[in-house]
UniProtKB/Swiss-Prot annotation:
This is Endoglucanase 7. Coiled coil: none annotated. Keywords: Carbohydrate metabolism, Cell wall biogenesis/degradation, Cellulose degradation, Glycosidase, Hydrolase, Polysaccharide degradation, Secreted, Signal. It is found in: Secreted. The keyword Zinc-finger does not apply. Its EC number is 3.2.1.4. The active site is at D89, H430, D482, E491. GO terms for molecular function: cellulase activity. It comes from Oryza sativa subsp. japonica (Rice). The gene is GLU10. Belongs to the glycosyl hydrolase 9 (cellulase E) family.
Length: 531
């Protein structure tokens, strides 16, 4: 027993050293503390209830919200009630909504047992289903998908509660004449991934989702084009800069995982070069740019041996690009110039760009954690970086955890960027509903510009706490201004929080295991001190 305990002590010391290394010099100087990942998990799932559009259910826990968008799609003769508002406004953008659901589903696929152990399985499934129920409505024909409800220009002119909306609820679709392979591909990915999640608890629903996913993928692949070329109104808000080829690969990989059918993997292998899957060396992962996610999913098939021998060579190329992303986050790519590695703030935060940088942090944390787990399944699991350096699974996992801890308050400002968590967090989130008196408390109509006049410019905290939201976060120097007008830093988005559902669940399990190990190790330290 004593020998086992001493080994555990050594393992804990090694883990602490890896965490210090992963956080960088600035983060090492920041005081580290234990975080309540279970509390963070519970709060993160509450956020999705605050973002609901449509008729709210009786078990709605975010009491300051009420029904909204109840006539969405009416002018077009289609029922588009439901879904999620993406951020602090009231447009329903299909591409980021679908990516949110994909990442929620991936969280559950990898760490669903951990979510269930924390007692949050039901809430997580509800969060996914609120999105997929909407996608079923929006996919009205095999080759037709409603991709947006509302207009960003008129919406941003007003500052209203969603319950008071007077802005346009025009709906926009993609179809054979106006293709949108990116939004259709991402929605296919979301529904395929969600079908895996619901396979045990609701097999009929899982089959329905898979049916829609397969139809949407066929539509996206057969009628190719960027959705922002078909829907001009989306260009100023969610332009598809990366194009649609990454979404086609992404959707095919999720359909392969959901069905096990070889032709989906053949598609990923056959189009690896021409679609950029084995060509693009990427250092970001987001609602727009899916290549790193594609490469990591493809590498998983290689690491776990879930492929035919004829696929090996191409999957090895995918793995090389996946490890470029991982090494870029670690700062280990010796070749490729300044853009080959992700910048770090003095406090250790991965920094990609000024506007809503936290989306890149949270998505990176998830990809790193998942890849570390995939590496752990391989006897020779290690990351090979450009220039000859290597990194083990433990180091990759430690960086993922360091990014999560930064979000939760282990940073130079000591602020949690997860709203409602800890003693210090943003109080003036750029969010219309949260910043105005709740509709249930005051049903007096608030007009389009009244919100700007009476609520937007207030220096006081928001009357409603947007629990579980992850705001845009600090700049490259770890600086942050908690001001409603500072939308680049204080606006939260659903796709910021979605990957953290899985991360909080995983880290909650790890923290529990560490406490158990510490309890075993403590007597051994005492015994060693007496020798």
């Amino acid at each position: 027993m004593r020998g086992r305990a001493l080994v555990l002590v050594a393992a804990l010391l090694l883990q602490l050293l890896l965490l210090a290394a992963a956080g960088g010099a600035g983060a090492a100087a920041t005081e580290r503390k234990a975080h309540n990942y279970e509390d963070a998990l519970r709060k993160s799932l509450l956020y999705f209830e605050a973002q609901r559009s449509g008729r709210l259910p009786h078990n709605q826990r975010v009491a300051w919200r009420d029904h909204s968008g109840l006539t969405d799609g009416l002018e077009q003769g289609v029922d588009l009630v439901g879904g999620y508002y993406d951020a602090g406004d009231h447009v329903k953008f299909g591409l980021p909504m679908a990516f949110t659901v994909t990442m929620l589903s991936w969280s559950m696929i990898e760490y669903g047992d951990d979510v269930e152990a924390a007692g949050e399985l039901g809430h997580a499934l509800e969060a996914i289903k609120w999105g997929t129920d909407y996608f079923i409505k929006a996919h009205t024909k095999p080759n037709e998908l409603w991709a947006e409800v509302g207009d960003g220009d008129t919406d941003h002119y007003c500052w209203q509660r969603p319950e008071d909306m007077t802005t346009s609820r025009q709906a926009y679709k993609v179809d054979r004449e106006r293709p949108g392979s990116d939004v259709a591909g991402e929605t296919a990915a979301a529904m395929a991934a969600a079908s895996i999640v619901f396979r045990k608890s609701n097999p009929h629903y899982a089959s329905l989702l898979l049916h829609h996913a397969q139809q949407l993928f066929e539509f996206a692949d057969k009628y190719r084009g960027k959705y922002d070329s078909s829907i001009a109104e989306v260009k100023s808000y969610y332009a598809s800069v990366s194009g649609y080829k990454d979404e086609l690969l992404w959707a095919a990989l999720w359909l392969h995982r959901a069905t096990g059918k070889a032709h989906y993997l053949d598609y990923v292998v056959d189009n690896a070069d021409c679609f950029g899957g084995t060509g693009w060396a990427i250092t970001e992962f987001s609602w727009d740019v899916k290549y790193a996610g594609v490469q990591i999913l493809a590498a998983r098939l290689l690491l776990r041996g879930e492929h035919e021998e004829r696929h090996r060579s191409t999957l090895e190329q995918y793995r090389a690009k996946a490890e470029h992303y991982v090494c870029g986050c670690l700062g280990r790519n010796a070749d490729g110039g300044a853009d080959a590695n992700v910048e770090r703030s003095p406090g250790g935060m991965l920094y990609v760009r000024q506007w809503n940088n936290m989306q890149y942090v949270t998505n990176a944390a998830f990809l790193l954690a998942a890849y570390a787990d995939y590496l752990g399944d391989d006897a020779d699991g290690a990351v090979s970086c450009a220039g000859g350096e290597t990194a083990g699974a433990g180091e990759v996992a430690a960086l993922a955890r360091a990014q999560v801890d930064y979000v939760l308050g282990t940073n130079p400002r000591g602020i949690s960027y997860l709203v409602g968590y800890g003693a210090k967090y943003p109080n003036r989130v750029h969010h219309r509903a949260a910043s105005i008196v709740p509709y249930k408390h005051s049903k007096e109509f608030i007009g389009c510009t009244q919100g700007f006049d009476h609520w937007f410019g207030r220096r006081s905290s928001n009357p409603n706490v947007l629990v579980g939201a992850i705001v845009g976060g600090p700049d490259r120097r770890d600086r942050f201004r908690d001001n409603r007008e500072n939308y680049m830093q204080t606006e939260a988005c659903t796709y910021n929080t979605a990957p953290m559902v899985g991360m909080f669940a995983k880290l909650n399990r790890m923290a529990r295991q560490e406490r158990e190990q510490e309890e075993v190790a403590a007597p051994a330290r005492s015994t060693a001190a007496d020798v």
